[in-house]
Amino acid sequence: MFSGSIPALVTPFRDGAFDAPTFARLVDWQVKEGTSALVPCGTTGESPTLSFDEHYRVIDCCIEAAAGRVPVIAGCGSNDTATAIRHMRHAQASGADAALIVAPYYNRPSQEGMIAHFKALADASDLPIVVYNVPGRTVADISAETMCKLAEIPTVVAVKDASGDLARVTVHRKGARHGFCQLSGNDELWLPHAVMGGAGCISVTANVAPRLCADFAAACAAGEWTRALALHDRLFDLHKAMFSDTSPGPVKYALSRVHDWFSPEVRLPIIPASGASRAVVDAALASAGVI
């Protein structure tokens, strides 16, 4: 259902408030640069710091700015099932194409609990669901076996896997229903993920280098692996630089270097990228030819 380069969009702030005009400008630039779909209100979008009203404004602004040119996969996850349902219902009413649902974090549900969570979401809304597995943040890990069971739910259409376990790509491909979409959640693993059957990546780096990431995705889709490897190598330092300090500090700083209209402002408890991180980002932007 989804493929290619899909940025997990940053949320721009100015003087502490959501900067809607800048966000709309960012979305328009992304689409024009070849981005395949958009994810507002994910981790990179600092969703834990957004009020419900802000969360919905970000989703609505993204849908309005995208104007039907590319799909919008709205971040709707929560460790409270009722809250996730509320987010999904708003996203669907606003015209989102799918919901990104992170594994319930902090309260550490069992595998059976996670299945029950996603079934409850599917029962409450027919909005397509992209399951997001990122055990490094959530602690709870959706096992490959559980993921294959979740894929039996008709509206669970894809997984964003950021476990770092590439073997899961094969397990999912062999065990999930035909056509189930696999998206990488790790930029630096996008190439091997694609070789093993992945359709694309929900990317941090694509915030900053959307054209390069779109070109890389196109090379993978065409099976042009020599070209894909060359682009992977060109982007690799930038992939790593995006996590040279706590995300999204580095990617917001990088965007401020690419566009003078973008502010690197973040919200507590995230703080701006350190001097050392900024130096790493500057070097990576230069080596990739982004600046």
From Swiss-Prot:
The keyword Ion transport does not apply. InterPro entries: Aldolase_TIM, DapA, DapA-like, Schiff_base-form_aldolases_AS, Schiff_base-form_aldolases_CS. Its main location: cytoplasm. One of its GO terms (molecular function) is 4-hydroxy-tetrahydrodipicolinate synthase activity. The active site is at 132 (proton donor/acceptor), 160 (schiff-base intermediate with substrate). It catalyses: L-aspartate 4-semialdehyde + pyruvate = (2S,4S)-4-hydroxy-2,3,4,5-tetrahydrodipicolinate + H2O + H(+). It comes from the Bacteria. The record marks 43, 106 as: Part of a proton relay during catalysis. It is found in: Cytoplasm. It is an enzyme of class 4 (lyase). It holds the Pfam family DHDPS. One of its GO terms (cellular component) is cytosol. Gene3D superfamilies: Aldolase class I. Pyruvate binds at residues 44, 202. Its EC number is 4.3.3.7. Pathway: Amino-acid biosynthesis; L-lysine biosynthesis via DAP pathway; (S)-tetrahydrodipicolinate from L-aspartate: step 3/4. Keywords: Amino-acid biosynthesis, Cytoplasm, Diaminopimelate biosynthesis, Lyase, Lysine biosynthesis, Schiff base. Homotetramer; dimer of dimers. Belongs to the DapA family. Catalyzes the condensation of (S)-aspartate-beta-semialdehyde [(S)-ASA] and pyruvate to 4-hydroxy-tetrahydrodipicolinate (HTPA). This is 4-hydroxy-tetrahydrodipicolinate synthase. The lineage of its organism: Bacteria, Pseudomonadati, Pseudomonadota, Alphaproteobacteria, Sphingomonadales. The gene is dapA.
